[in-house]
């Protein structure tokens, strides 16, 4: 799950490059991220690296990750550092880490 449409496209591209057919749910806001997340049984969150995004991700019991740069989302990371960087962050979520542990 993520907030923005472009963010979701970057996550989907990274997942496909990892040979995953996982669905990406785009929630369009941090508020919706927490709300929609409570309706879904399991998953992980690629949070925007800002106060609202992190707070929403922490409300859910799932693994969650964020870009290493404050203010960035997955699409910003994709544009700055490439798809490999997005894959690397996603692998942490797949391994069950919360918040880039």
What are these regions (language model features)?
Residues 5-101:
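TOPRIM fold recognition
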């Amino acid at each position: 799950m993520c907030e923005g449409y472009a963010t979701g496209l970057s996550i989907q591209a990274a997942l496909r490059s990892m040979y995953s057919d996982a669905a990406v749910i785009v929630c369009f806001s941090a508020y919706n991220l927490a709300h929609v997340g409570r309706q879904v049984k399991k998953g992980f969150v690629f949070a925007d690296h800002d106060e609202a995004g992190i707070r929403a991700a922490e409300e859910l019991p799932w693994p969650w990750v964020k870009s290493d740069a404050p203010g960035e989302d997955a699409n910003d990371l994709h544009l700055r550092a490439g798809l490999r960087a997005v894959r690397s962050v996603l692998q942490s979520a797949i391994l069950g880490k919360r918040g880039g542990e």
